[in-house]
Amino acid sequence: MSGTLLAFDFGTKSIGVAVGQRITGTARPLPAIKAQDGTPDWNLIERLLKEWQPDEIIVGLPLNMDGTEQPLTARARKFANRIHGRFGVEVKLHDERLSTVEARSGLFEQGGYRALNKGKIDSASAVIILESYFEQGY
């Protein structure tokens, strides 16, 4: 086991990506993947898996603030199931509430409005999802 994990922040137009290390509990953004109505370029996902060889994948689970599911929740679950089905890697879902808000805030502090492009926000959200996963002791 390498201790490497990949995280995805699922979206219908853009999917944020982050890579992290379980040993250090740290994560960093990778370029976001464009999606068409939630469907990514699966060849790109396959390349990421071959390059990073993660022990597991974390997919952010979008929930309402009260913990109930929203329309995007089922699509994120389907995305996670497809990754597992196509590539056989272990996939876990992790609550992503407020990750996008936190990502926007952090990027804005670093570079104002210029830093707020969609791909950067989505991958920064994936970092937050993965760091939150580590913080919860997984």
Curated annotation (Swiss-Prot):
<comment type="similarity">
    <text>Belongs to the YqgF nuclease family.</text>
</comment>
<dbReference type="GO" id="GO:0004518">
    <property type="term" value="F:nuclease activity"/>
</dbReference>
<dbReference type="InterPro" id="IPR012337">
    <property type="entry name" value="RNaseH-like_sf"/>
</dbReference>
<keyword id="KW-0378">Hydrolase</keyword>
<dbReference type="GO" id="GO:0000967">
    <property type="term" value="P:rRNA 5'-end processing"/>
</dbReference>
<keyword id="KW-0540">Nuclease</keyword>
<dbReference type="InterPro" id="IPR005227">
    <property type="entry name" value="YqgF"/>
</dbReference>
<dbReference type="GO" id="GO:0005829">
    <property type="term" value="C:cytosol"/>
</dbReference>
<dbReference type="InterPro" id="IPR037027">
    <property type="entry name" value="YqgF/RNaseH-like_dom_sf"/>
</dbReference>
<keyword id="KW-0963">Cytoplasm</keyword>
<dbReference type="InterPro" id="IPR006641">
    <property type="entry name" value="YqgF/RNaseH-like_dom"/>
</dbReference>
<comment type="function">
    <text>Could be a nuclease involved in processing of the 5'-end of pre-16S rRNA.</text>
</comment>
<dbReference type="Pfam" id="PF03652">
    <property type="entry name" value="RuvX"/>
</dbReference>
<protein>
    <recommendedName>
        <fullName>Putative pre-16S rRNA nuclease</fullName>
        <ecNumber>3.1.-.-</ecNumber>
    </recommendedName>
</protein>
<keyword id="KW-0690">Ribosome biogenesis</keyword>
